[in-house]
Amino acid sequence: MGLTAYGNRRVQPGELPFGANLTLIHTRAQPVICSKLLLTKRVSPISFFLSKFQNSWGEDGWVQLDQLPSPNAVSSDQVHCSAGCTHRKCGWAASKSKEKVPARPHGVCDGVCTDYSQCTQPCPPDTQGNMGFSCRQKTWHKITDTCQTLNALNIFEEDSRLVQPFEDNIKISVYTGKSETITDMLLQKCPTDLSCVIRNIQQSPWIPGNIAVIVQLLHNISTAIWTGVDEAKMQSYSTIANHILNSKSISNWTFIPDRNSSYILLHSVNSFARRLFIDKHPVDISDVFIHTMGTTISGDNIGKNFTFSMRINDTSNEVTGRVLISRDELRKVPSPSQVISIAFPTIGAILEASLLENVTVNGLVLSAILPKELKRISLIFEKISKSEERRTQCVGWHSVENRWDQQACKMIQENSQQAVCKCRPSKLFTSFSILMSPHILESLILTYITYVGLGISICSLILCLSIEVLVWSQVTKTEITYLRHVCIVNIAATLLMADVWFIVASFLSGPITHHKGCVAATFFVHFFYLSVFFWMLAKALLILYGIMIVFHTLPKSVLVASLFSVGYGCPLAIAAITVAATEPGKGYLRPEICWLNWDMTKALLAFVIPALAIVVVNLITVTLVIVKTQRAAIGNSMFQEVRAIVRISKNIAILTPLLGLTWGFGVATVIDDRSLAFHIIFSLLNAFQVSPDASDQVQSERIHEDVL
């Protein structure tokens, strides 16, 4: 369907249907047409494709179009030809238009708002796109931003054929053929070195829309060019990427609607570098925020390493990173082969902004593009934050799941200045770095409390068991007292063994761990601490048995067998299943610590869930004891009521450590792991948990009498 419009005719709403072939003839007359056009194909002098839209006339010859863009569109621009065209030549390029589109009034998303409501506001003048806001605590907060200045008309360096004014009677035809992307135009205009967009990109502001455009351009280039990537192309590619890796752009990455943009950038740079051909001389392409080095290697090389020193921010402070390939590994590769490494000082922070997770990259991000025969490399990271109170993890970027993964690397050595990692490069893992945990609590006070309390606890447990041996025949004359002391002895014995294995595990933990020894220590720590809880559960069940069942009793042998089944059988089953299910996949242990893994397999739940469930059951038991002893005081004199209150308080004081209720403070340390107070209280209460057992055994004998 064809349609022709002349300069002295106004186009009415709905007069331009979807897919129409429109020819506009410019004359020296009244306003021609002002429209928001989608550029897809450049012919002579220029061609446009108009997608579906609704148009209406505005003031001074403006036409407002609300359009549904073609999926092939690569740019959207405002064009204005006013009445002034009768006295001058009217340029069609948006970058040359002197008259600006009246922006929607700002302040639409200002003021008090309703929580969780959203609104959209147009971008400032000279930019295209919208800003999205969300209301939180009755205040508008920006969440997305698509404002951009870059498009197909201005991303290239000035071309007289593109921006020259139209002469009289020049025809502009609408072309509906196959679209041409910015990447296609780039490869046509400067196929040798991709440099024809560098100047305008470097002059563009670091706003979210521009960042998204450049990321997409880099991605398209990396997928379009499969061969012939030489040093000149890599230099231009690096310069383009360097612009959006600038430290001043980091805050704007959070507003890009596509959260995958930072992942796409990292993957695109690595993919393009993989196609770099290195001739005779090593490649060294250095920009401020990206540094690429590459060379050819052979099996007779002694060893190879790349050393980077880059600024993290706008200060003069620099951090270093090194990639080392051992001679043994080099012997595995065919000759000649090439290795390439890329260092990024800021992309770690950019990934953090996109991930919205509580992790901090504490060094350079180093990418290693290696022959598939190379299975091991060593990486040395200088720490950005050199705090000794932070735990460091060696990680690799999982290119499929888009997250940092501890399975790719292992810590070899660490001090306050640097960390040495051994990593396994593969198709999934190309980029590596070190993470700093922001909330791990390392306190000398807490350490002293733990070890001093542990020593006192071990001494108290030994004293408790010694007293039990001395008075065993006197305190086990009845069946109920015998069962009660069986529970006390096993609680003390299992807690003593747990403390001993805890000390063993602490000595085995560190940057360099003995894996099999660490697995054994973790298994026994898990088993014995679970046994402590299950024996405390058995003690609680025995108290409930005494309260609820008075006249009907079970044989002593059945009760003893039941207690041992609960105390040792259940923990053994849980610990064995945990190690069998997680260790084959190397998900049983934490990195550098001999304890159950959390990040990968959530193996720690095999301890947390049973322990907290037992604490809840024991809390119910204590409540029933309080209720039972309180009933005895009803109707008695004031003196007897006071005695009952004292008796109840004493029962609570004895049962709380005996049944492990102090472990409930562990919930507080999980909810707020940054609180030093909760950690100190938890350490104090549990370090001295068994101390009362050595001195209050006689008092515990009276609890059963009180509740009957």
Swiss-Prot record:
GO molecular function, one term: G protein-coupled receptor activity
Any GO BP annotation: G protein-coupled receptor signaling pathway
Membrane topology: Multi-pass membrane protein
Disulphide bridges, residue numbers: C394-C421, C409-C423
Organ and tissue specificity: High expression in kidney. Up-regulated in lung adenocarcinomas and prostate cancers.
Transmembrane intervals: 452-472, 488-508, 531-551, 558-578, 607-627, 651-671, 675-695
Highest taxon of the lineage: Eukaryota
Record flagged with keyword Membrane: yes
Further information: Most adhesion GPCRs undergo autoproteolysis at the GPS domain. ADGRF2 is not autoproteolyzed at the GPS motif because of the lack of a consensus catalytic triad sequence within GPS region of the GAIN-B domain.
Name of this protein: Putative adhesion G protein-coupled receptor F2P
Source organism of this protein record: Homo sapiens (Human)
